[in-house]
Structure formats: C-alpha cells, structure tokens
Amino acid sequence: MYQSHEFYLRRAIEISKEAREAGNTPFGALLVNKEGEIIMEQGNIEITEKICTGHAEATLAARASHEYSREFLWDCTLYTTAEPCAMCAGAVSYTHLRAHETELH
C-alpha cells in the first residue's frame, strides 16, 4: 500500500541518521516499487567502506540495477534526503528510475 511522500522521506531521514551513527556522512536513500513497498534502503558508506563513490543514491542505484530489470525500475520511485550530486544523478539516470523525491511538502 502506497504511503505519503512524507512517510518515505522521513524513513530516508532515519537511514541518514543511521549512516551518521555508523561514521559516514548523513545521507540516505530508499527505493519504492509501484505498489508502495520499500524494496531497498541505503545510507552513505564512503567513509566506513573506503569507497569514494559510496554515496547513498549511487550505491542504491548500482544495487538496484543488479537486482531488478530496467522495466521494473522505471515504475519505482527513489526518495533521498538531499538533491543528488552530479555523480549520483548520473547513476540514477542510467538506472532508469522514473522519479525521485527530495523534499517534504
């Protein structure tokens, strides 16, 4: 069942807090399928994993593209705690995610 954008964004904020508590920069992302189910979550991992591209959005995009087809991802929505940087925006674009939300309204 689909929840409000606020629900998903608040969960993304919680993921960012978890990333910070783990020693990373506080960013989070999650992927929601067309039925409204959260199917993937990711916090930043660039510090603890020593991966310079370990931003939440890019890492989630890479994981999602390995696990799901482009057609499936087209109907998914990415929620993030901030507007993606250029690297992450490119990764999201190549993953063929239909949309992303970054703001509470």
Regions found by a protein language model. Name each.
Residues T48-A58:
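A short, polar/charged loop-to-alpha-helix boundary motif
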Residues I39-E46:
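Short beta->alpha transition motifs characteristic of CBS
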Residues F72-A82:
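Immediate flanking context of iron-sulfur cluster ligation sites
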Residues F27-V32:
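Short beta-strand scaffold segments in enzyme catalytic cores
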Residues Y2-E21:
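Short, basic/aromatic recognition patches
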Residues T81-Y94:
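Local cysteine-cluster metal-coordination motifs and their immediate loop/turn environment
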Residues T95-L104:
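Conserved small/polar residues in nucleotide/adenosyl-binding loops
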